Structures are given as structure tokens and as C-alpha cells.
Amino acid sequence: MSEKQTGSANGGLGKTLAQLEQVVSASLRPLPSQTGDGTYVTEQVKTGILKDLSHVDLGDLKTLVDVSKSALTGEALDDRKYIMERVIQLSAGLPSTSQIGKELTNTFLTTLWNDLEHPPISYLGRDAMYRRADGSGNNVLWPHIGAAGTPYARSVQPKTVQSPNLPDPETLFDCLLARKEYKEHPNKISSVLFYIASIIIHDLFETDRKDPAISLTSSYLDLSPLYGNNQQEQDLIRTFKDGKLKPDCFSTKRVLGFPPDVGVVLIMFNRFHNYVVEKLAMINEGGRFTKPQESDTAAYAKYDNDLFQTGRLVTCGLYVNIILKDYVRTILNINRTDSIWSLDPRSEMKDGLLGRAAAQATGNQVAAEFNLVYRWHSCISQRDQKWTEDMYQELFPGQDPSKISLQDFLRGLGRWEAKLPGEPRERPFAGLQRKADGSYDDNDLVKIFEESVEDCAGAFGALHVPTVFRSIEALGIQQARSWNLATLNEFRKYFNLAPYKTFEEINSDPYVADQLKRLYDHPDRVEIYPGIIVEDAKESMAPGSGLCTNFTISRAILSDAVALVRGDRFHTVDFTPKHLTNWAYNEIQPQDSVDQTHVFYKLVLRAFPNHFRGDSIYAHFPLVVPSENKKILTKLGTADKYSWDRPNYTPPPQFINSHSACMSILSDQETFKVTWGSKIEFLMRHNNQPYGRDFMLSGDRTPNAMSRQMMGKALYRDKWETEVKRFYENITLKLLHRYSYKLAGVNQVDVVRDIANLAQVHFCASVFSLPLKTESNPRGIFTESELYQIMAVVFTSIFYDADIGKSFELNQAARAVTQQLGQLTLANVELIAKTGFIANLVNSLHRHDVLSEYGVHMIQRLLDSGMPAPEIVWTHVLPTAGGMVANQAQLFSQSLDYYLSEEGSVHLPEINRLAKEDTTEADDLLLRYFMEGARIRSSVALPRVVAQPTVVEDNGQKITLKQGQHIICNLVSASMDPVTFPEPDKVKLDRDMNLYAHFGFGPHQCLGLGLCKTALTTMLKVIGRLDNLRRAPGGQGKLKKLSGPGGIAMYMTPDQTAFFPFPTTMKIQWDGDLPEVKE
């Protein structure tokens, strides 16, 4: 009998014995007498842990450990380790009577259930895609929650028996609130923080005068003071054209009763919205905002609405980021530290051993108690107190505000509001006059904002509300009573705060404590309002206590902030790049490396791009007065990163467009000066030494000319042309072999990212002995991609710093990487200077046989001049290298892009033929093809500053230029000037080579002109040799570019999250095999 048969027989025998055992057991049972139907009562037997362990092996124990570890830490499970399947095996392997097996199965079922929302909280469809005007539909299943026109919620159950005869509201004001003397805020918080608070308050609370239980605004942070509380109000603020709002308008009338600074902040959000929708339409991500003909009414209405609604989501997203990253961080005094921590309710949470994750996107309904929490009149500055007193004199001429009866006060407010026009553009604002386009003059708005930043707010506490607010506070007390709310102590207990046992605990000032005692008799009877604003204020603590508000308020506002944000679907589960677009989502995100994640500057610089420097302290930290910010940032060691100058208008540069005018300006070094010196010095300054000032492009002085002469001699050696040509042919082919691949049998490569950009990186590293990590130099520091990014950032910071909203971030990043690269390069140069042995060793690490005259040899030639190594590196090598890589790469990519276009592709067969000829004549024609492609796709613009008054003729017009005026020589338009280039849209190979403008002109013409022409023509030759060269299908085969000012191209990153001055990606395809690399 075989082993298999024996096993089968034994198994059968075991089964038979088990059956016999069951029969015997059944025969020994007593008759069933416990049931009426004659059946036995059975008990489910549960096996114990010892019996279960007999079914568990080491693999099962490992499964339990892995699952427990994930539950404890929240760490994701690696499904490639088959943990789910192992759990199933373990559960299935335990006896059916196993209690552990049952618990394990139930846990598994619970996990699977909890994987999905029940019910779902995010939905598809246009109805759920955007915020509704009245806030309804935030919770799709309970759409009324938080909608405008619904009742306030009640948070705290009022159980305390209170006297029906409570103290007179005006007496309460006089006893507890009236300002005796002004006290500045202890942390020197500016009034801007309280203007943001005013917007938040009026975003969430607007009590219906006819029914005080109703709030006329939504319960969400949706910027309703700007956009309106309902569809009718929202329609009044919209232009219904291209998704835009009416310029410099806001919906609410109530803000006009506040100092104009509040309205200015709303106008800034208005401008940000209009900026966003312009960019959304321009980028048109995935064809989402393709503009139809306006005659197609329905299609255009959809286009306009999609832009408007998406722009609103984005603007509200920035608004909430300002609240969480600027406002709340300042409230908690984290702005005084170098921490990037923030109390962000959008944090991703998962259930764990310590409890369930907080729910999100549930909706929100504001509570009446919180309507009272945010009444912060004690913090009104002396400046704003004066403004309010002046306004009262307009409303109630000759009357003392403290003596106005409540009835007269309400009638006066009613008359004032009734006079305000319904049309937002017609309402008076701060005495300003609108311009023809409906906007206000930037100078006026900036002046108001600037003064707001410098205006220190008042302190929290009793006896600090200006008397002009007597009637308003009395109305607030009456309103609170009409809501029948809980007492101060009940409100504190709700937040698990100890109730006050004595009046001195409420306020340690003997006078205030005594007044409370006379008014309320017992601490338990003190009303929530004014109780919460007469408590002692917290002391400053960094981090922890920055607002220094009353004790109960400091706790309540944090709970409210979490509820408002985490409960809002559009700020949580639907706050995604898919809803906002990749660019817009990235545009409003905080950066860890900028301002410790503060984002207010994003609003300021988009609203007033011509008044603030990119590093202005007024833009970056406006919630604290500048003088206090100076102390804070000096202590943190970052004060020198910012400009402390007051905002000042800088006119946009004058564009010069004709070829003749551009060439004339670029040739006139006396009248027109270069502007890059301060940028170069900023990046190159090292160990407090002002390096970079004498670099060739830093100025128009003699040392700058000498720098150009020195670097020119170093670059253009004997046989340079032969060496450069051989290098580029070799490296281009090598990169093609390394980075190309086949998709379904078709050759493909990203010709921009992996060929054009990296070829320049390799050349630059070889020429200047930079620490590039490659297969032949594994001990290098930077990868090809990293070194390209460094060089691109440096070049952008110096020559393309045109986006004021990104300027600070760009320049700080550029300085950081420049310093890092510079120190490594300096160490290398100093080694070469000290010893020939090490120099030879370094040379072997960086050597490229083709470039025998460069690398270590070139560094040695520079050292032979007697110049110190730091001066060589920081003033000459780094700026030259930084100006080379990205510029050369973009010129090649732009030229190739033209020849891959529909109009340019007719030339590809001839380029292919010439590339294969490999003759001097063919190479000369390829150079002309390259120059024409680069001319047609040029995106070069060169700035100059006018040194002395002059007149320039540009396209037949006389332009008067003033001293100090900034101009832009637009080489895009100059390169397409039909006077210089007849039929400019066509490729002509007989044009005068001296007229091409894309390398600049005059004494600051690109030093690498000759080198570039040779290098990039060689690259065109290698790529052009590929058969049936063509774009990859779809968007991947095209450069994503938009037309900026003056027609200058703006490119985008591959994921379209940001603009970039250079091409970033474009994939090409071809037929046949690549030629072998000739070593």
C-alpha cells in the first residue's frame, strides 16, 4: 500500500471512530425534559485560549504582531506581505468554537466596514461640486445644516435659575465695560488681526432683526461678507463675465459701518478671486475651462459659473489658510518661535487604540453662545476709536454717544443702512473715488492697509470698551438675554473648565470683582455676556498665549475653529487638487520654508503687486506691528530676510518692442544700466563678504568688464569648438541611450527633462569641476536632476524674478542652494590650489576626455591670475555656471518645439537629411535652422534701468524715459519684427546672423554665444538624425506654455502646479535604433 493510500486509510479510520464516539455519547444522554417540544437544550461551547494556541504557529503570531502594530501606530499595512490573507488563514484555522477566532473575525469585519464612510460624505455631480450661495448642501444628506436663514444652535443647556430682573444693560456697561484708560495689546498685535476677526464674525453671524433666533448668514467660513448670504446678493457682486467679481466690491453693507481697513481686506480677497479666475482660464487644466462663444448663452453661462465657483473655492481656501496659519498661530503666539506647528483641523486622522478619529465634513450650525464669544470691542485701537466716534457724529450730530437711547440708536442705524445703494459699486467707501474701470486707486488702498499694520490694537479685559460702543454693547446684552442662554459658569463647565467660586476668580481687580458682586450676588448667576469679556485676560506665553484674551474665550475660540473647518466639506474631503485644479491648490498652500507656514503674503502681493517688495514685512507678518516683528525676527535670526521699508509704488516697466530700439538700448551702456547686481550679490554673499559685485553681469563698471574678459579667455581656448562639438555629440547620444525606452515597441524619451536639460548640466559640471554624481563619478554630491534644479533656480532668481507673489520663496531657495553648491565648489578649488597631486585626483573624478582644456585645468588657469579662491568661486565661477545651464537648455527646447509643431515640421525631413550628411556645409545649415527655430520661439526679455533722461523711438512712437525708470527690452517681439526679419513667421536660412536677438546684444551679450551655437546645433544634429521624429501623442508631447506680459512665454511644471520660466517636459518619438556611442 502506498504512503498516500495509508494516509487515506488512517484518515477514514479516524473519521469512523469519531462518528462511533458521537453515537455512544448520544445513547448515554438522558431524555429531554427541559423543553416542551421534546428537543435538547444545547449550550455553545467556547474553547479557551490554551486550546486555541494549539492551532496557532509562529507565522500566526507574526500576523497578530503586524496587525497590532498597525492598529497602535496607524502605520500602513504592506499588502504585498499578504497580511489580509494571513488574517483569513488564522481565523479559518481556529476552531469554530474559538472565542479568539470570533473576536478576530469581528475585528476584521469592523475594519472592512470602517474602510468606507457610512453614509458617504463626498459626492460627484455638479450639485455637490460647488458651494451654494446660502451655504446649504454642505452636508449632502442634511442640506439645511448651516444654511443661511436657519436658527442658531444652542451649545449649553441652561439649568441655573436666574432672576427675571437682571441688571440694566447700560448700567452693566458703565460698571464693567466702559474704557477708563487705553492699554496697548501686550504682544503688540496689530489691528489687522482684528479686521480678520471682524470678517470671520460677520461671515458666521448676522442675526435677523425680525427674528433674533435666525442667522441670515451661513455657518461656514465661506467669505459671505464678500460673496453674499444668498443667491440674490451673490448675483449682485458678480459680473457674469469670465467668472469675475465686480472690481473692488464686497457684498455686505454692514462692513461699511466699520473702519475702512476691514473693507480693504475684503477688497484684497476680491482681487485675489479675480486673479485666480484669470489664471484658471489661462491654464485651462485638462480643458476644464475651455471658453465657448459668448453667443452660445448656455455654454458661456456654464463657463462663467465654473470659473466663478472654482475661484470662490480657491479664495475661501486661502482665507482659511490665513485663519489657521497666520491668525491662529498669532493667537497662540507660535509666530514668536521657529516652529512650523499649527492647529490645523484638516489633519488626516485614523481610528487608533487611543480613540476614534474626529469626524469631518458633517456640516456645522453656529451656536448663539459663540455669537457672544467674538465681541472684542475692548481691543479697538485709539485710531479706530476716533474713526467710530467721527462716524457717530455723522449719524447723530451733536449728541453724546454715551447718552443716546437704544431706540434712537436703532433708528439712526436703520436710516444709515436704508441710504446705502443696493448696487455694491455705488456704495460710498472711505471717501474714495472709483476709476473708469470701477476699481479704486491702489495708492489709497495701500495707505489704509499700511496704517492698519502699524496700528497697535488694544488689550482684552474689563473696563476697556470705548464708550462710543455703549449702545451696541447694551443691545448685545439684551440680545443674549432674549436667547435664554446658559450662565458664564455653565458655559465654562461645558468645556470642562472649573467654574468660578468667587468674583475675584472672575476678575482679580477689586473694583471689578466688587461691581460683579453688587450686580449678581453670586458667581453662578453671572451671565455669559458680559461675563466672558470681563474675566481676567491671560498673560503672554510663547508659544501658547498670544491673543491674551479672557480665559474662557481663549478655550472656546479654538473649539469653534476646529468645528468650523473640520465640519466643512469644502475645507476637508473636497479640498483637493481635483476640485481646485493643481495650480490653484498649490498656489494657496503654505510652505514650511517660508514664514514658518504663514500665508498672508499671498493675499497682499496678489492684491497690490506694484507696491510691496517680495520680502516686505508688511506683507509677510501684518498681524503684528513692524516694530515688534523686528524684535521677534531678530531673536529668531531671520530679520535680515525681510525689507522693513514702508510700501512704495513701483511703476511697471516700460516694454520696448522693436528690434532697432532694443539693439540701440542694449548697446548703450551709459544711458541704460543692467539691473542684476543686487540679485547676484544677494546670492553670492558669503561669510559677510560682498562677493558677486564684480561679476560681468552685475554692473557696468570696469571690474565687470574685466570679469567678462577673464571668463572669456578661460572658456574660449584653442580647439574649444572641436572639443565642445565632440562633447555634445557624445553626451546627447549617451543620454538618449540612458533615458529612452519603448512603449508598445515605439521609441520615446522626454527630450526636455532628460536630454536638453541634462546635457547642459554635464557640460557645466565638466567645465567648472562641479560635484555631479554620475556612474563614472559616484562620489559626486548632486544628481543630474538636482544640479539642474539648482542652476535653474539660481538663473530664475537673478534673471526671471518677475512674479512678485513667488519672489521671496524663490530668492530664499536660490540663496540656500547657491550657498550649498558654492561651499562644495570652493572646497574643490582650494584643493586644486593647494596640491597638484590632489588636483590630478580631482581631475580624474571629474574628467571628460573630450574636454581636456576644461575642468581642473580651467580652474588652475583662473587661480594663476592670483585671485583668491573664494573670489574665483563666488564672483566668477558660480554666476557664470548659473547663467549657462537653464538658458542653453531652454533655447534648444524652444527651437526643437518649433520644428515639432504643425508649421515647423515641414522642415524636419531636410533637418534629418542634413544631420546625416556630417559635413561642414550641412552643419552650417543646421546652425541656421537652430537659430531660426530659437528666434521664432524666443522667450527672452532683458531689463535695464534708465541712467539719464532720454527719448527712444519704438515702432514709430517717441517714448520719453525718465531717470530711474525700468524698461524691458522685449526680444520676443524684437525677434519677430518684420522690419528686421521679413516674413518673421517663416524659416529663412539666409538671414543675417548678426541680427539674431535671443542671445542679447552689446557689451552684455551672452558670453557663451559661440559656445551655445556650437553646442545646441550639435544637439539638434543628433536629435534631428532620428527617423520620423515626432511628438508623443497628447499633452505629453507638447510644451505647456502660456502667453505672459509682452507675449513672453510662461511654462508650467509637469504636474501644472506652478509656472516656470523654462520648458520642463516634452516627449518625442522616433523610428529605428539609436546609433552607438563612440567612446
From Swiss-Prot:
CDD domains: CYP_LDS-like_C, linoleate_diol_synthase_like. It catalyses: (9Z,12Z)-octadecadienoate + O2 = (8R,9Z,12Z)-8-hydroperoxyoctadeca-9,12-dienoate; (8R,9Z,12Z)-8-hydroperoxyoctadeca-9,12-dienoate = (5S,8R,9Z,12Z)-5,8-dihydroxyoctadeca-9,12-dienoate. Its cofactor is heme b. InterPro entries: Cyt_P450 (IPR001128), Cyt_P450_CS (IPR017972), Cyt_P450_sf (IPR036396), Haem_peroxidase_animal (IPR019791), Haem_peroxidase_sf (IPR010255), Haem_peroxidase_sf_animal (IPR037120), Oxylipin_biosynth_metab (IPR050783), Ppo-like_N (IPR034812). Heme b binds at H202, H377. One of its GO terms (molecular function) is oxidoreductase activity, acting on paired donors, with incorporation or reduction of molecular oxygen. Its EC number is 1.13.11.60, 5.4.4.5. Pfam families: An_peroxidase (PF03098), p450 (PF00067). Residues 654-1079 are annotated as: 9,12-octadecadienoate 8-hydroperoxide 8R-isomerase. Bifunctional heme-containing enzyme that oxidizes linoleic acid to (8R,9Z,12Z)-8-hydroperoxyoctadeca-9,12-dienoate (within the N-terminal heme peroxidase domain), which is subsequently isomerized to (5S,8R,9Z,12Z)-5,8-dihydroxyoctadeca-9,12-dienoate (within the C-terminal P450 heme thiolate domain). Oxidized unsaturated fatty acids, so-called oxylipins, derived from endogenous fatty acids, influence the development of the asexual conidiophores and sexual cleistothecia and regulate the secondary metabolism. This is Psi-producing oxygenase A. It comes from Aspergillus fumigatus (strain ATCC MYA-4609 / CBS 101355 / FGSC A1100 / Af293) (Neosartorya fumigata).
